[in-house]
Amino acid sequence: MAGAGDGARAVKRNAALLALGSILALSSALVVAQDAPESLLPPGFDKPRPAPPRAAPAPVTVTKGSTSSGSSSVSVPVVQQVPGAATPVAAGLPAGVRIPTLQELEAMSPDELDALLGLKPRSDMPPAARRSRKQVGVLADYEGGLPAGALAQQSGALVRAALDGNKGQLVSRWGHILLRRALASRLDAPQGMNPADFAASRAALLVRMGEGDAARAIVQDVDAGNYTDSLTRAAIDAYAFTADITGICPVISVQGGARKDAEWRVLRTVCQAFQGDGAAAMAQLDRMQGGKVWPEIDMLLAQKYAGAAGKARRAVTIEWDGVSEMTPWRYAFTIATGLEPPAALMRGAADRYAYSAALAPMVPLTARAEGADKAAAAGILSSAAMVDLYSQIYAQEDITGDWSDRSSLLRDAYTGETPADRMAAISQLWDGAGNPRVRYSRMVLTAYAAARMPVEDSFAGQSADLVASMLAAGLDGNALRWAAQAEVGSLTWAQLTLAAPGRGNPVTSGALESFYSDDNSENYRKSRFLIAGLAGLGRVDQATAADFASKLEIDLNRQTRWTRLITQAADVNNPALVCFLAGVGMQGDGWDKMTSVHLYHIVSALNRVGLGAEARMIAAEAVARG
């Protein structure tokens, strides 16, 4: 891990140690000189011989009118002082400064020596490579990100509240994708908000959303020397989520003693091991054992991880007896050392561990697929990523059982001899899900296979699910092939009416009544979402919308502080603020937590600020999953 900066710092440290050693030696010599015995030479022998008296120079008379050729010159000898002739004077140490003993120096870590000798780095980047904090993010506007200056004139307090107040769990897959894009964009900080703190709030929300890789990219876009306390905290959480434990080491090296908590002490010691001081680091971790700093299981996992950096390679036995819960660093150290967490602990664990497993390359493929069954519905994994994962499972001959069977079904969904064979394989993948969320993840998985299905009457009964599967991956063009076959008032028709890029004629009240009469969802939720989406997209006239909303006993014009804020953001054409506020309005663990009023304002605001494609997908998803 040592780079050019570490090498230069090591040279400086050695030079400083030599200088410190010289001071120690010189101070010792002075003490010896003060306590030396009296001279044994006879009196006078230790005194320098007096210099002979110097003769006065003879006066020189200059004759008037004499020329330069006739003048006499007297050479004056140049006397140069002999080096060392002057009495040496020891440079005094500042008052209150104590020189460490040799034993203390030997016990110091490299970071402590750097701090003692004034070699502590102020940045993890050389001067020529340091980056501006003006725009922090990973997506420029020409790469699909939002406009950089969208928040420059906005209130920092409002933006902070929208980010910090979001718990990270959104009901909509497409809402999650949109918010991730907004958070990862290269943006100027809003007024009155430190750019590093702005990056911290975005990274922290991405971690809560399960987007560890995006969060890590955000914190890595800021030089460690510019970190604030909040950004340091967000970075620790991001590296824990991705199990990239040594990724935090540059931050710890620069921030040094900024924190003294147990987490920081353990991570600092682990980083010390990977900086080449393995023996001292392992000894320090040994002293932290016994539950004094971290729980015993966490200290053992940290020792196992740090031990990989040293030459000793000592064995560490991990015993899970008595461990009742999973924690972020416990999980990170477990998968980073190649271990599998106990199944009993993972059954009741939070979704963040499933999301982490789905993205972690060191986790077994079957465990990743199990995590993907949750991550895809949330919006963390794309359809292409799911297909790639199942393809790896199919290629592994040593994987058997349910996951092997599912990978074979996915292959049949693409390569079945007849459309009926392909449809049967797709249906088996859907129906094999244990709950609606997993079923929707399987729809994400089969999106491209669904797009290859022919539009035939024999598949009309599955058309709503086929369309929902295609729209889960944004394949609206493929889904619209079913428009001619879709019966007005059906679920297929409702999804396509919302997902279509444009619509010439507004939806009639008769079509809405037909959909309402066949709506079996709880409290007519699908009908509520349909009218909210159509009104937000402007695809139904106001009178028809008002009449249908009245029948459903909803008031789309009801105002709250949130509705006023997102409407004002749309009025000034601010897509970034609209996205952040839409994220606030989409929080929940299921579509039963979404209201038709919130959906209407979200779809309307997104459509007005140029995010019509996202608005259409969110509206169609709401009807499909409501």
Listing of model-derived features with the role each one plays in the protein:
Residues 143-153, 167-168, 183-192, 219-227, ...:
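Solenoid-like repeat scaffolds
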Residues 205, 234-239, 271-272, 468-469, ...:
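Residue-level signature for tetratricopeptide repeat
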Residues 33-101:
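N-terminal propeptides/low-complexity segments immediately following signal peptides
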Residues 247-341, 496, 500:
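Extended amphipathic alpha-helical segments with heptad-repeat/coiled-coil character used for oligomerization
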Residues 126-192, 198, 202:
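N-terminal, Lys/Arg-enriched amphipathic/low-complexity engagement segments
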Residues 26-30:
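N-terminal signal peptide c-region/cleavage motif recognized by signal peptidases
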Residues 192-199, 224-233, 258-267, 280, ...:
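Generic helix N-cap/helix-start motif at coil->alpha-helix transitions
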Residues 300-475:
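Long, internal scaffold/assembly segments composed of regular secondary structure
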